Amino acid sequence: MPLAREVVDQLAISLGVCIRPVPMRCLDTTTGSARIVDIPCGATLESKCPPCAKRNLQLRKAQCREGWHLDHEPVIPATEPTDEQRYLVELRAQLQALRDQAERDGEDLAPWDDALAEVDADLRRSGLRGSVLGRTPTGRRRSTRRRQDAPDLPKRKKVSSTLGRVYESPDGQRFRPSMFITLTLPSYGRILDGAPVDPAAYDYRRAARDALHFSKLVDRFVQNLRRVAGWDVQYFATVEPQKRLAPHLHLAMRGTLSRAEIKQIAAATYHQVWWPPTDHVVFDGDTLPVWEDEVGYLDPRTGEVLPTWDQALDALADEDAEPLHVLTFGNQVDAKGVLGGTERADHLIKHYLTKYLTKSIAETCDPDNPRQKDHADRMADALRYEPCSPTCPNWLRYGVQPKGAKPGQAPGQCRGKGHKPEHLGYPGRRVLVSRKWSNKTLTDHRADRRAWVLETLGLSATAGTDPNRYTWRPIPPGDPDLPPLGQRLLIEIANRQRWRALLAEHQAQADDTDLSATEVVAA
């Protein structure tokens, strides 16, 4: 017989109730009353919370569908800064002036740097994007010439548009098709049933580095795509795992180019990783760098201070220096034309662009396939000591202090996403959407769904209360006022059943009204 608690979870999942809710205490500042509200966890993986993952999947489908064949230019309204943002920028300017004066006077800059960092954090929390300082020059210059082994790309004059070309049929019908593109990484060795035929000959090191930097290669492809197209190409892309556990890209593009041009762009796209070399292991086993306050990490054998991250990059300023790694796409490039509102477009959205969004990259590995499981384990071993970012502690293994080094770091103990087994090296976002895709953020799409429900129930989606009326506080575990999770789930299940019945009743009434109106017109 099943456990009662399991039945509760199953019923909650079937009704779309979050099974890992975050309890919050909501205080009404007007009446002084407080109540406990369960906020959905918002998980995107089905293994963590199926209802939240399904809800996010539906939002992504709507986002992809609305922007793919948009026939008008999206307009992003300018947002005026708030009073808080203006105040913080003014405060930032005053602190920067005082910090510069302290630097000229030879004073200690640490207090000023801490104050500036705190204001910068407040600016980010207020909703401002980017940095008030912009890009800080490092003094290092890198040649922008293309690699000699990369083919050149054509370049069209850019026009201010996000829409593709319009085609007209002989009978006068106008079409604005779009494209579906699939890009893969190169081969690292022969694969059979999702695992290498010869694991010893499989290039795990290259596979690991390609996975870690795959998002940068995608950025380069989009840059080249826009340069060749001549307009501001908009895209909705998802990064999915292949059976061989390597990431590949599905990209919905608004507008069209020829298949030959798409393949030419993919062949000419590359990304160079200009990081310090990792060919020579300096510290291994029990011999690891030691931390010294005010200095950083030292070589325990000689007492010498290890080169900092900036010093290691300065050593790459030599014209003869080679990048740590060069990424390219593989030969398998697929490009298809797609018309909006067709079954093919819906099929590509459901079965390619969003099919695996509720699963982690590692979940494509069949646990009942020992060869594939061993393949995943070998991939994890290859990633263990591979640096994933400038701040990765693995740089200590190769005699370089990571950027922003701090005590307690050690090779093989990086907590970055790329080193976690469920990501298999890919640390980036699974969904990549350009800013002018659907002219809506994911929050806007979520608000659309909420507005539809409220409208169906005959309620207003715009008549909101004072945003400052309620204050929200997280409830810590063990709070005596917090009911058990099972009890809270039962309450949410009852609420969901009541809401569904009410929604179905209003929909039925609306259908009857529409039917009656149709009958009157017909009469």
Regions found by a protein language model. Name each.
Residues 43-46, 59, 175, 208-219, ...:
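Conserved structured core elements
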Residues 53-55, 95-243:
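Signature for HUH/AEP ssDNA processing cores
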Residues 57-60, 189-193, 260-262, 361-362:
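Short helix/loop capping segments that flank catalytic or ligand/cofactor-binding pockets
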Residues 252-322:
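Helical (often loop-to-helix) elements that flank the catalytic cores of nucleotide-handling enzymes
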